[in-house]
Amino acid sequence: MNVINIEHLTHSFTERLLFDDVSFYLSDKDKVGVIGINGTGKSTLLKIIAGKETADRADIIMQRDLRIAYLPQIPEFADTHTTLSGALPLTEEISDQPENYIPQAKSMLHQLGFTRYDQPITELSGGQRKRIALVRT
């Protein structure tokens, strides 16, 4: 069963054509790797699939109950974020109050090896920040 069908994907980035009428599908059993040299559109393709970026042209059909999370290469956090606040969903993307997510976020952070929830994001390594961003997705 196909969970994603993409047809006629065309997209440019600053005058450079990244995708020219590309079509493909992913089934529920597929495991896919996206490989290529720097600047060929790997991250852009994933952002388009996740709905974080809009293609110049594409017909994208996804299974109705499909949930997609996108974890950027370099997660962005405010300098004021702590381990816990950085793990909470972004308030403009959720309908509930962030406080409703605190117990689940703490549990997931603990599973990933975090014990201090008040530690400033600025004190964490890139890998630690990526794990916090994973909790947020």
Question: Which role fits each region the language model picked out?
Answer:
Residues 2, 8, 66-68, 73-132, ...:
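ABC-family P-loop ATPase nucleotide-binding domains
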Residues 4, 18-21:
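Conserved structural motif at the start of ABC-family nucleotide-binding domains
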Residues 8-10, 21-24, 59:
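Conserved N-terminal beta-strand of ABC nucleotide-binding domains
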Residues 26-28:
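Conserved hydrophobic segment flanking the Walker A/P-loop of ABC-type ATPase nucleotide-binding domains
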Residues 35-37:
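The feature captures the beta-strand-to-loop junction immediately N-terminal to the Walker
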Residues 50:
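Helix-to-loop junction immediately C-terminal to a conserved catalytic motif
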Residues 56-64:
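ABC nucleotide-binding domain "signature motif"
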